[in-house]
Every structure is written in C-alpha cells, then in structure tokens.
Amino acid sequence: MYRVAVLYEHEPDAEAYAEHAELCSQVPGGVFRHGKVTGSPMGDPAHAYYAEWEFADEQAFRSAIRSDEFMATGKDAYKRGFPPPTVEFLELS
C-alpha cells in the first residue's frame, strides 16, 4: 500500500478546503481523506490538518502522482493560498 501524506501546520479555511477536496478526489486510482489533527502523545501536535491519498499498489501510486489531476491539486492549493504543507510519499507493508 502507498500513501501521499499532506501535513499542514495551520488549518486551511474549511469552505475552501471542501472545494479543494472535491478536486483531490478526482486523482485516479486512489482514495482521498482529510481532517483535523486532534492531538499528539507529547504536548501540542506539530500539525493542525492532515490529508492523504491511499493507493493499493506501487503502479497505481506512480501513475497517480504523474497524472494531470494530481498536478492540478498542487496548483489549486497554491492559488487558494493554503499554508504550504509538508508532503511525503509512504510505502506501507
């Protein structure tokens, strides 16, 4: 299983992010989820908001991150003025 994790230090505007999430859900081959970070085991969490795409396998992941739809999500987030996120790619066993 592969994931793209998107971590925001500050929570984006809820209405604008709901519109952005619709675009994110169009990335082929994956499932998109997002929500507030609610805590951490040691003090305040480092991030306020989390989003992810989940892909069943490497082929679906590689295809998705090269897709026009995936590229459009980054452009849309920038145009909306969302706080710059940390984006990481994960392989899970």
Name each region found by the language model.
Residues R62-F89:
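C-terminal structural segments of small proteins and small subunits
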Residues M1-R66, E88-S93:
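Short S/T/G/P-rich N-terminal loop/turn motif that feeds into the first structured element of a domain
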